[in-house]
């Protein structure tokens, strides 16, 4: 059985490039782009399946996963630092509920694999900035950083307790050539 991949948050800086690359590897029909917003001339819509999705709508998320028989989820939806600070409750709800829903999908065996990016925002200002070790002081000072640190712990927990295959990378501030810097840079 070929993998079917759902990319949540596909209209963002990373998502747009990721969907294009995944479609070149897995085939256009095997990579479902999803986002809360959709541009009318969006290449993601023209090149393969697109599902409008507010990732905080757990029922709709489950419906999409079942409809396409999704095997992998790339969860990129998040409220980043600059936009999260004035919207603390929304940021926490979006950043944590979405991860919880996707982890539960894997725990319940609907999907096989999760990719969820973390961020250097987990460190905060007290972390050594030169040759930062993997295991070090983590004192995030933004709601985004706090949610990413909590998310890392949840991913570890689900992996250890339920054998969920979840992978993550701590991204630095990213700037792409196709999009303007947004809420995180």
Whereabouts are the PLM-identified features?
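Active-site helix of classical SDR
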Residues: 143, 147-150
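Conserved Rossmann-fold NAD(P)-dependent oxidoreductase catalytic core, especially the SDR/UDP-sugar
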Residues: 100-143
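NAD(P)H-binding glycine-rich loop region in Rossmannoid oxidoreductase-like domains
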Residues: 55-94
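N-terminal Rossmann NAD(P)H-binding glycine-rich loop of SDR-like oxidoreductase domains
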Residues: 4-25
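Rossmann-fold cofactor-recognition segment
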Residues: 45-57
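A hydrophobic alpha-helix adjacent to the NAD(P)-binding/active-site core of NAD(P)-dependent oxidoreductases
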Residues: 50, 91-92, 106, 114
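Flexible, glycine-rich beta-alpha linker
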Residues: 123-124, 142-143, 167-185
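Conserved beta-loop-beta element that borders a ligand/cofactor-binding pocket
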Residues: 118-119, 152-177
């Amino acid at each position: 059985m070929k993998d079917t991949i759902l990319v949540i948050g596909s209209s963002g800086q990373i998502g747009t490039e990721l969907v294009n690359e995944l479609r070149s590897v897995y085939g256009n029909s095997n990579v479902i782009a999803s986002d809360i917003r959709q541009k009318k001339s969006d290449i993601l819509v023209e090149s393969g399946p697109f599902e409008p999705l507010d990732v905080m709508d757990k029922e709709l998320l489950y419906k999409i996963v079942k409809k396409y028989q999704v095997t992998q989820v790339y969860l990129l939806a998040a409220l980043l630092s600059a936009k999260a600070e004035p919207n603390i409750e929304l940021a926490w709800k979006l950043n944590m509920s979405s991860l919880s829903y996707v982890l539960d999908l894997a725990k319940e065996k609907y999907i096989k694999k999760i990719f969820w990016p973390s961020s250097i925002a987990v460190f905060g200002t007290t972390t050594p900035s030169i040759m930062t070790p993997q295991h070090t002081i983590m004192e995030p000072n933004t709601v985004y950083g706090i949610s990413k640190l909590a998310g890392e712990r949840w991913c570890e927990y689900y992996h250890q307790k339920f054998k969920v295959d979840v992978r993550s990378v701590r991204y630095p501030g990213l700037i792409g050539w196709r999009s303007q810097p947004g809420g995180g840079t």
